[in-house]
Every structure is written in structure tokens, then in C-alpha cells.
């Protein structure tokens, strides 16, 4: 019997209900093994299954499956404060809390086996790492520091809670303060730290651009394109050829425009709207036909799959495909011929798509419009711009009306519409931050989002009913346990949600967002709600999108910057244009799509993490020269160690309780408030106060505030010293650890899936707050 087949047989045997852990000899007897060769195969299979974590050997040398032995296999998600959670491989199981002393040298991302502890505190399941099956971290980015005989690297990733020991012969030219990439040569063992050698010196930590370069290396973001991909890009023509037009619908005589940001270079979507005689609208969404140029398994395609998505950092874009294509032949630049895939829809006055057609086309856009100019035409009634674009103004007004119809329909069905502010960090040519401003979101931005949403839904539904292998954008229903915590949380503010944690419609959550709109608690309730939900991801199954409250959704509209969109285009070409729906074709895609969906979802999360980190880094840098300055802000979160205050430009800092010196403040957990025991002063979420910047740590991305008007010295230092033991039994070095975990509004889940807009609040001065009466429940 082949090894794989024997392993499968052995695993099936152990999964039987009557099975109890057995020794090798007992298994030999139970499986009627008589030949020496068969016994060798049994031992090899047991070793292989144990290495994969599929079975476990007990101290008495008995073998069984983890689930029957109070064990769970999963991935470690570490926290900067030393503890971690196990994310079980079986997604139906809840996360398991791992205390710091129970990690047993496991690091963030490691695949481990955890034994559940019978005496877990409260309702939270706790566990102990008993075996590390697979190490995740091979390289670490950090700051090099040295002593006389050795060096060490302080990791940028605070989830790695111990420094990396660098022997003298492993520093490879690194000097004090250098940002370096370290290759690990051994992992933590007992009281000894991980050991490594310097592989790359990025530069001194204070050199321009090194901060962002460190983030790029930390997250493993790609650099230059491979030579074969660049060669393919160079050989791609700059203009379309007559032969490219075969079997394409010619739309070059239509009035079609792109509407994007003023600095956008990769224009992958164009739109047109016509009002029909019966009151319906004809909407054309035309997307750059990237799949025509990036063919399957070509060098660019392989690299695009690996990258998964373009990454938009504050000072640069790391593109998914080479700029020669993304900014050139694939970009729908004005007044030039471009190949597209089109989705034309007829939409009635209720926002229903009554007819649609998906086809390949060629277009020539009439104008390259900006959000700013369209907003000035539609919102500000700018006469100069109306005159400049006079032939287009009626279409823009039709677009505005159609977008409102589509939005009304989406909200009526219960889509969850978050209302977070979103910031944009402006930097100079050297990467130094100039300003942090709020991204304006007005009519033009929203109408494009509505058009992209309806096109994505229409394409998804079309292929759902074709019943062929496809890739969808899904957003599953929230985890009942997390949602239950949110429902309990909102009751402290007097709100009651219709439905239960196990059975809730998105409309019920939207009703809460409507109720808190422009109220002090809006930000924190929206944030906690968002965090109670699952992340949207890609999947071969059409499972619907909870947040958008739609049964069918995919990503069709951005093939320049998202690989799943490119796959959707490839499938449109395969199934619709080439008519290949045979069994072999479907089997091929049914086999490939699960891996593509999983990988691109992972690459999307990597990109979001890197983008968020560079934003936070530059926000802290922006505040470095603001120490001593005063700002108006709003309390965005209250914890037992202080209050987080958000400034109007979304920058957030901590007022540590030790800086609240006019009284002794206690944390009222039920009402998320700080209450002065002597004065009765109350600080709660949503209160507007004036703060002074007292400290900024760019490396830790921490900003410290104090409340203006509170005099005196802090009662105790904010920073808590914690020791990190050094390898080889060297004395521990004291490290300053952050004690805060900011509750910040998350950036939009992705363009088009959540809306954001700034909001205005009444200002409350200083710390002289009278206690508020208890809020009444919403009816």
C-alpha cells in the first residue's frame, strides 16, 4: 500500500468513535500487520502524521487524534504584551487564550498544538502550547544595538517580544542604530532568545525613507519585478492593433468618462449613463481589459498572482503589474483607444437591474474627470467648470440621480453603512510628512462607488446562475460569540438591537448606526461593531456579503490592482467570450480557485496591515514637532489606564490616567467613563476636550497627551519597565513597553464596501464636565 493511502487509512481508523489511543504494538495487532515491511510502513506513517500535527503521541507512547485528547492544532496570534491566542485550524472552534508563561517559546504565526486547560478563568478557554509543528518567522526587521562582545536586534514587530541575539561574527557590518534584516539561525529555547545573523543593512533608522523601507521588509512586500516580467512588459505594445478589435463591440462614439482622484495614474474604470424614455437608466461600466495583455501563466501573471494586490503606502505604490502596463496600455487614458470588458445594465426607478449584458469592447474616453471637478459641478454649481464641460453636465446630473436610487435601494435592503473619517498623509519628495488631512468624500466619490457596486453584484449573480467555478467576494455572518459581546456593549449606552447573536439581519445593525449618527458614542459603537464582524475575503463559493446585504458579490472593477478581478476577467473570457464551459475547463478552475482565493485574501490582509502601519508611523512623525502645542479633540475610547483622544485629522493619542492629576479617577467600565472621586468630574466617550502634546515615540507609534488645565506632576510614569532576557544567560536589558491598545476607527474595508464622511460635533471645553444623566433606551 502506498504511504499516502496507508496514512489515510490509519487516520480514518483513529477517527472512529470507538477508537482509544493505542501503542505501536497495539496498532500492529489491531491492523493485522504481520510482515516486517508493513510494520516499517506503520512506523513511517505514524511519524509523518505526528509531524503534520494530524495525530499526537502521549507520554505513554500511545497515538490518537488531537480532538479526542483535549488538544487543538492552530496558528499563534501573538500580542505585544506577551500573551497570545490560538486561531484553531478548525474554524468552527473558538480562539484559545495562551498566557505568556504557557507559550513555551512559540512565536507569532507558528503552527502549534495546544492542550486545553481544565481550569480556565471565567468563560474564556485557555491553553498551553505543547508542541511547535512549524515555525513561521524566518527573518526579522529591527534596530541593531551592540555591546562589547555581541549585539542584538530590537524587532520592529512588537508581537516578537524578545530581542534577537547577534553573535559578534553575525553582525556583518551593522552598526549601532542601523535598521537591519536578520535571518534567524536558531529559535528560542528555554530561557535563551532566538539567534540570528544580519542579512541586509537597510540604513540608519533616522535616514530619510528608511522607516517605510523597514515596513516593506517587515511585511515581506515585493520589490522590483523579475527580469522576465519586465521583458514581457517592454514587449507589450503602447497602442492597440486593428487585429485586437476582432469580435469587440465598438463603443468609441459613446460619451464615456473616467472619474478619479487628481493624482491617479492607473485608470481602470470608465462610466456612462443615459436616461431612457421610460424613466429607466442605462449604465455602462467599462473596465480595462488587463487579461488581454496579461495572459495565463505568463511571467507577469505569475508575479501578479504572487503579489495579489497593489499596495498603497504613504510615499509610494507597490504595483501588482508593471507601471508600463498599469499606467500605459491598460489605463483608460483620455481620448485614446483602449480595450475593455463592459457590463451594461438597464436600471429602473426602484434601482433594480432589469437587463444586463457582459461583453468585450473598445472605447475612447471623452474626458478624464476628477472627483474634485465633478463635485464642484454637482455640489458647488461652479459656473466656470459647468461651461468648460457643458456637454457632459446633463450626464453628470443623471449619474447623481441614478447613484442616489442605487444607494436608497441598498440601504432599504439593510446594507451596513459605516461612517468613519479617513485620513490622507501628505509627504514630500524625501518621504517627510507635510500634513495629515481628511479625505473628502462627496457626491462624485459616492456615485462611482455605487456604479462599481452594482456592476460587481451583476457580474456575480450572472455567474452564480451559470453554475460554473468562479471567484466571489464574500462577507460571512458575524461570529455569534463576538456579536453577543457587541450586543451587550451597546446596551450600556441604552440601545437595544432587534435579533439575537445567532440570528441577526444586517438591517438591525444599520439601525444602531442610524441611531448613533452624530452622537458622542458614534465612533466607539461603530468601531466595536466593525470588529465584531468577520473580514471580507475571496472564496469559490457564492456565500453572499453580509455587510452589503446582498446574495451575490464579486470584484470585477479593478483588474490593474487586484488579482481576483483579473481572474474574474479571465473567467468571463473563458466562459462567455470563448464559450468554453466543458467539463475539463470547469474541473481545472474548480481545482485552482480555492488556492487563488486563499492566497489573495492573505495578500490583501498583508497590504492592509502595511498601509495602516505606514499611516500610523507618519502620523506619529507629524506630531514630533508639535510637542507643547494644544489641540481640540474628542475622547474616542476610555480604558482603565486612561483615555484615547482623537484629533479632527484622525490622529489619536493617549491621556494616561497618571496625567489626570486634579483628582483620583476611577474607570466606570459599564459607562466607559473616568469619574473623579473628589470633584465628580466625568470624562466619557464623545466628550470634546483640549489636549496638549507631551510626548511622541515614532518607533512605537505612540502619542501622549495631557488635558489642558490640569497642573502638576504625573502621579507615576506612564511607561512600565519590562525585562527581556538575553540569550546565553546575559543580564536582561530593560525595555520600555507600550501599555496602550488604541481603539481606532479601522480604515474602510475596501473601496466601495464602506462609506466614510467627516462629522461635526459640539465642543466641550477642558475637563470641567458635569455628570450626565443616564441615557434612555432607544425605542
From Swiss-Prot:
InterPro entries: CSD, CSD2, NA-bd_OB-fold, RNase_B_OB_dom, RNase_II/R, RNase_II/R_CS, RNase_II/RNase_R, RNase_R. Residues 248-577 form the RNB domain. Residues 628-708 form the S1 motif domain. GO terms for cellular component: cytosol. Keywords: Cytoplasm, Exonuclease, Hydrolase, Nuclease, RNA-binding. Belongs to the RNR ribonuclease family. RNase R subfamily. 3'-5' exoribonuclease that releases 5'-nucleoside monophosphates and is involved in maturation of structured RNAs. Involved in degradation of type I toxin-antitoxin system bsrG/SR4 RNAs. This is Ribonuclease R.
Amino acid at each position: 500500500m502506498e504511504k499516502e493511502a496507508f496514512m489515510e487509512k490509519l487516520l480514518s481508523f483513529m477517527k472512529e468513535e470507538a477508537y482509544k489511543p493505542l501503542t505501536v504494538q497495539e496498532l500492529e495487532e489491531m491492523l493485522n500487520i504481520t510482515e516486517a515491511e508493513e510494520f516499517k510502513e506503520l512506523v513511517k506513517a505514524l511519524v509523518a502524521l505526528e509531524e503534520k500535527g494530524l495525530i499526537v503521541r502521549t507520554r505513554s507512547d500511545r497515538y490518537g487524534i488531537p480532538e479526542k485528547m483535549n488538544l487543538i492544532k492552530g496558528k499563534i496570534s501573538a500580542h505585544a504584551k506577551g500573551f497570545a491566542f490560538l486561531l484553531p485550524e478548525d474554524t468552527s472552534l473558538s480562539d484559545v487564550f495562551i498566557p505568556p508563561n504557557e507559550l513555551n517559546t512559540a512565536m507569532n504565526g507558528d503552527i502549534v498544538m495546544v492542550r486545553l486547560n481544565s481550569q480556565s478563568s471565567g468563560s474564556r478557554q485557555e491553553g498551553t502550547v505543547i508542541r511547535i509543528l512549524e515555525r513561521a518567522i524566518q527573518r526579522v526587521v529591527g534596530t541593531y544595538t551592540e555591546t562589547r562582545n555581541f549585539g542584538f536586534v530590537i524587532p520592529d514587530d512588537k508581537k516578537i517580544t524578545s530581542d534577537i541575539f547577534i553573535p559578534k561574527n553575525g553582525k556583518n557590518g551593522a552598526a549601532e542604530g542601523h535598521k537591519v534584516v536578520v535571518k534567524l539561525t536558531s529559535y528560542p529555547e528555554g530561557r535563551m532568545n532566538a539567534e540570528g545573523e544580519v542579512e541586509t543593512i537597510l540604513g540608519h533608522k533616522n535616514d530619510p525613507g528608511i522607516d517605510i523601507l523597514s515596513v516593506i521588509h517587515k511585511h515581506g512586500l515585493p520589490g522590483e519585478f523579475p527580469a522576465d516580467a519586465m521583458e514581457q512588459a517592454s514587449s507589450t505594445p503602447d497602442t492597440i492593433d486593428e487585429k485586437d478589435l476582432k469580435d469587440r463591440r465598438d463603443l468609441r462614439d459613446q460619451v464615456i468618462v473616467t472619474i478619479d482622484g487628481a493624482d491617479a495614474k492607473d485608470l481602470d474604470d470608465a462610466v456612462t449613463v443615459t436616461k431612457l424614455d421610460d424613466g429607466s437608466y442605462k449604465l455602462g461600466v467599462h473596465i480595462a481589459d488587463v487579461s488581454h495583455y496579461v495572459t495565463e501563466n505568463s511571467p507577469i501573471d505569475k508575479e501578479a498572482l504572487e503579489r495579489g494586490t497593489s499596495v498603497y503606502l504613504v510615499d509610494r505604490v507597490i504595483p501588482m503589474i508593471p507601471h508600463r502596463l498599469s499606467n500605459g496600455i491598460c489605463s483608460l487614458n483620455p481620448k485614446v483607444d483602449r480595450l475593455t470588458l463592459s457590463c451594461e445594465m438597464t436600471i429602473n426607478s426602484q434601482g433594480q437591474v432589469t437587463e444586463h449584458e457582459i461583453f468585450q469592447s473598445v472605447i475612447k474616453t471623452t474626458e478624464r474627470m476628477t472627483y474634485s471637478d465633478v463635485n464642484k459641478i454637482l455640489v458647488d454649481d461652479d459656473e466656470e467648470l459647468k461651461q468648460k464641460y457643458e456637454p457632459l453636465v446633463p450626464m453628470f446630473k443623471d449619474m447623481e440621480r441614478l447613484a442616489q436610487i442605487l444607494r436608497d435601494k441598498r440601504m432599504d435592503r439593510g446594507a451596513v453603512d459605516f461612517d468613519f473619517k479617513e485620513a490622507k498623509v501628505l509627504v514630500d519628495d524625501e518621504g517627510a510628512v507635510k500634513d495629515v488631512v481628511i479625505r473628502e468624500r462627496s457626491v462624485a466619490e459616492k456615485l462611482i462607488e455605487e456604479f462599481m457596486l452594482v456592476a460587481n453584484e451583476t457580474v456575480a449573480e450572472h455567474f452564480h446562475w451559470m453554475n460554473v467555478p468562479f471567484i466571489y467576494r464574500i462577507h460571512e455572518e458575524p461570529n455569534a460569540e463576538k456579536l453577543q459581546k457587541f450586543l451587550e456593549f451597546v446596551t450600556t449606552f441604552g440601545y437595544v438591537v432587534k435579533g439575537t447573536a445567532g440570528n441577526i439581519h444586517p438591517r438591525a445593525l444599520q439601525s444602531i448606526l442610524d441611531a448613533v449618527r452624530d452622537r458622542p458614542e458614534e465612533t466607539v459603537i461603530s468601531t466595536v461593531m466593525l470588529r465584531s464582524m468577520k473580514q471580507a475575503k475571496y472564496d469559490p463559493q457564492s456565500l453572499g456579503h453580509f455587510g452589503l446585504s446582498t446574495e451575490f458579490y464579486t470584484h470585477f472593477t479593478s483588474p490593474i490592482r487586484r488579482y481576483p478581478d483579473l481572474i474574474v476577467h479571465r473567467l468571463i473570457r473563458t466562459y462567455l467570450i470563448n464559450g468554453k464551459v466543458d467539463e475539463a475547463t470547469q474541473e481545472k478552475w474548480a481545482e485552482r480557485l480555492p488556492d487563488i482565493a486563499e492566497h489573495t485574501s492573505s495578500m490583501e490582509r498583508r497590504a492592509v496591515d502595511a498601509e495602516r502601519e505606514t499611516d500610523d508611523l507618519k502620523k506619529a512623525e507629524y506630531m514630533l514637532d508639535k510637542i507643547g502645542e494644544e489641540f481640540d479633540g474628542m475622547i474616542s475610547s476610555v480604558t482603565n489606564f486612561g483615555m484615547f483622544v482623537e484629533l479632527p485629522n484622525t490622529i489619536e493619542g493617549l491621556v494616561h490616567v497618571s496625567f489626570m492629576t486634579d483628582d483620583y479617577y476611577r474607570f466606570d467600565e459599564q459607562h466607559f467613563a473616568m469619574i473623579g472621586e473628589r470633584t465628580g468630574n466625568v470624562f466619557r466617550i464623545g466628550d470634546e476636550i483640549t489636549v496638549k502634546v507631551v510626548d511622541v515615540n515614532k518607533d512605537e507609534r505612540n502619542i501622549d497627551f495631557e488635558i489642558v488645565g490640569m497642573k502638576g506632576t504625573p502621579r507615576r510614569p506612564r511607561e512600565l519597565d519590562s525585562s527581556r532576557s538575553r540569550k546565553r544567560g546575559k543580564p536582561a536589558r530593560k525595555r520600555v513597553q507600550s501599555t496602550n491598545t488604541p481603539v481606532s476607527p479601522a480604515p474602510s474595508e475596501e473601496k466601495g464596501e464602506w462609506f466614510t464622511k467627516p462629522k461635526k460635533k459640539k465642543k466641550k471645553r477642558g475637563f470641567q464636565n458635569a455628570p450626565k444623566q443616564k441615557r434612555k433606551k432607544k425605542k
